[in-house]
């Protein structure tokens, strides 16, 4: 005898009400994140996901779920095949997801209260460096190769200005005279952070450093006792702090509805609380022409980034 569930399926398939039954199948709305801290991310983003899900009952979504992926390649597959409906990512990762999955950035997430930011290039006041071209033949320190403000963004800023970049495995190595040498702080220190990056520039172990304008303004990342000896000599374009992307499997109507829910979250007490629990998100806003233009810069430049083994 066949199992009851199989018999039930056969009954539904032969029923004249099969279409309406399929339309009313309960669906799960899934939010995708990349992290190595799965349990923490699930806990913090579940209220956010459930809030969005509650507004999508008309599309058959009755449950919300958070799925954490180990890398963006896995998330791209999930967005492309529709097992994940929306996801969050920083601009460079978001543009990679767009290219690999066909997903689309639909809104800006004010992660940790910030709408946008940019990279500052800074040096010791006694270095003689006044512009990007002065970095040729010298060494620039980035924090780590996964950092937006302390690698991706400053690197494409240099490349778009026609500069050559040369990876240096050791801090004792020197770049060619016509190249800008760069290294990653996390490959040289057990504790890689913004304050240690500031110290390297302050002590002139390297010619310059790069991190976000918010790091520059934060005494925890750059103490006032050091800041007086340092100076900013260049800045990148401003980019969104974080983005929400939608799966290409969603209809335009569904995308518009989801976007509408996201943009209105801060206006309700429950929505605002859900945002705050999710990495202290202040609000979610629409992409402005300025931010769309900066994303296009990222989109057209990301292939320029050097491949470092």
What do the predicted segments below correspond to?
Residues 9-15:
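Bacterial N-terminal signal peptides
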Residues 24-95:
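Extracytoplasmic small-molecule ligand-binding "clamshell" domains
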Residues 24-50, 239, 245-246, 250-309:
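An extracytoplasmic/periplasmic, membrane-proximal ligand-sensing/linker region
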Residues 29-42, 134-151:
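Short loop->beta-strand "edge-of-pocket" segments that line small-molecule binding or catalytic clefts
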Residues 79-80, 135, 201-202:
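Hydrophobic residues within well-ordered alpha-helices
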């Amino acid at each position: 005898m066949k199992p009851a569930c199989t018999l039930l399926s056969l009954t539904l398939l032969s029923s004249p009400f099969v279409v309406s039954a399929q339309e009313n199948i309960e669906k799960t709305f899934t939010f995708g994140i990349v992290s190595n801290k799965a349990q923490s991310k699930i806990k913090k983003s579940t209220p956010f996901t459930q809030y969005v899900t509650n507004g999508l009952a008309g599309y058959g979504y009755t449950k919300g779920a958070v799925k954490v992926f180990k890398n963006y390649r896995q998330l791209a597959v999930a967005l492309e095949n529709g097992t994940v409906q929306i996801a969050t990512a920083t601009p460079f990762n978001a543009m990679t997801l767009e290219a690999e999955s066909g997903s689309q950035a639909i809104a800006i997430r004010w992660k940790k209260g910030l709408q946008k930011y940019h990279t500052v290039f800074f040096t010791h006041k006694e270095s003689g460096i006044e512009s990007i071209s002065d970095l040729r033949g010298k060494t620039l320190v980035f924090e780590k190769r996964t950092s937006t403000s302390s690698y991706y963004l400053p690197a494409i800023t240099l490349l778009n200005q026609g500069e050559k970049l040369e990876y240096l495995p050791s801090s004792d190595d020197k770049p060619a005279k016509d190249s800008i040498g760069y290294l990653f702080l996390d490959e040289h220190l057990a504790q890689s952070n913004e304050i240690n990056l500031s110290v390297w520039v302050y002590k002139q172990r390297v010619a310059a450093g790069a991190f976000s304008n918010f790091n520059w303004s934060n005494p925890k990342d750059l103490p006032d006792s050091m800041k007086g000896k340092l100076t900013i000599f260049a800045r990148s374009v401003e980019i969104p702090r974080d983005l929400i992307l939608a799966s290409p499997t969603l209809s335009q109507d569904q995308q518009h509805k989801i976007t509408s829910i996201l943009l209105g979250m801060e206006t309700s007490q429950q929505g605002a609380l859900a945002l705050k629990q999710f990495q202290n998100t202040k609000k979610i806003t629409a992409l402005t022409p300025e931010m769309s233009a900066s994303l296009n810069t990222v989109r057209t430049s990301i292939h320029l980034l050097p491949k470092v083994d």
